[in-house]
Amino acid sequence: MGRNHDGRSTNWRISSDRFIGREPQLERIAVGLQGAADGRPNALVLSATAGLGLSRLLAETRDRIASLAEPFASVHGVARPATSGVPYAPITSALEDLLAPLPDETLAALVGPTGDALARLVPGIKPRLAELELLPARPRIAAAEWREARMFEAVLGLLERLGERQPVALMIEDLHHADAATRGLVTFLARVTRGQRVMLLVTYQPDRLLRSDPLRATLSALSSSPTVGTGEISPLERQELVQLIESIEGGRPSSTTLLLVAERSRGNALMAEELLAARRELQGVSVSGSFARLVTTRAGLRSPECRRVLRLLSLAGSTVSMSTLLAMAAEFEARSSARPRRLATGIRQAEGLDEDIAVGVTEAIEHGFLSETIARPRYEAGAAAGGILAAGGTLAGAPNGRVPRERGDRENPARDARGRTGGRRADRGDRSGSDPGRSSYLQHRGAVQLPVSDIQFGFRHELIAEALAADLLPATRRRYHAALAAAYDTEADPQPAAAMAHHLAAQELAEA
């Protein structure tokens, strides 16, 4: 459900809750998954311009993997601008999500003899590795090139041991934002074939690459391997646009609407969604502007609370927790000479900074600017977290646990992945997958079972963040960067530390 320009609830959505098109790409992924299940490691590199749906394709792939009769381990990492200088950042986050919830016995079996290298790669599991006596008594000293080689072998060994229990789908999203170490590791994993049951799925945006971009050398190295395939996501066809509009607006589009969306979007799903939202919210206003103009004009209709949240997050460069967002807002307010402008008309929606931010987040989600994700729960003694590899070697628990088929029904990952239909809703980063307006933060902020630190907020698509960030005045940008850096300064994790340096560099080069 959404709301129109005067705040009344409507029955339209911001994004489609159905997965539309992309069958050729899903077919290729399914073949790759079958190859991995049969012990034939392979890789697939997919490219598409921004907004065509690469993130959603990966989310759909994860959904379908989660429903396979034969359990697959799905490992997913995203390279983000704010952590582009952190070595192995997307690999670190992906492996921490995989390893942190595991019981001790399973963790020890997967880590094996590579505890020291994996502890450097995934600092979050280092205390547990020390408790399990998986770290050497003395740190090993080696030259830089040997440290890199050992790191590569440690990751490959981990994937091999994981593959012995179940096939692995390793997905690295937005490689154009990745650091040199991540690019080197991806090349190594794609080209080394030792019978591991692993499929590597990598995505990037070619329109983001400069002529001298180092990723071009990585892509050349990948394409030279016989086990690496490539593919490109094309714009949606007209009939697929019809399905998209039907799913969003709840009915078949008029010829005028279809013509407008088809001509303006040129098959770009994100642009089509923004055009439809603009037509509903900007009544009497031309929707002939650019994507950025549509986004900023829609944002201008929102409350001061919502606009403050959007401005803060537009420069963050990654998803943030509610606690970090509150810290950012407090830092900015402390540095501002004037308090943030309150609502000019109507009843105040909230009292106090925390309530203002909560109201702003909810409104931003409701109008399709932000999406939210729930952090994967950490392992607790006596129970395996949902969707995590259990000691017996299967994916156990909700929401990703699978119920085996009846005996005699042969398991075929490729057939199952192809045969499933779209139309499901999932937690995806490039659309508002949750019920708009029903923020998990507001639903659960008083509940013991879901701390607010477990809820992450980010833009539905990075193009939305870029449009809003570009609309900020230079002096305002510097103040927001300073507030973001100060909020990250209290976090010990290397990725927030890199984000802090990123924001310091944007406004105080000497401190960075």
Q: Which residues does each predicted region cover?
A:
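P-loop NTPase Walker A phosphate-binding motif
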Residues: T49-S84, A89-T92
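Conserved Walker-type P-loop NTP-binding/catalytic site
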Residues: G2-R8, A89-A169, S220-S223, T227, ...
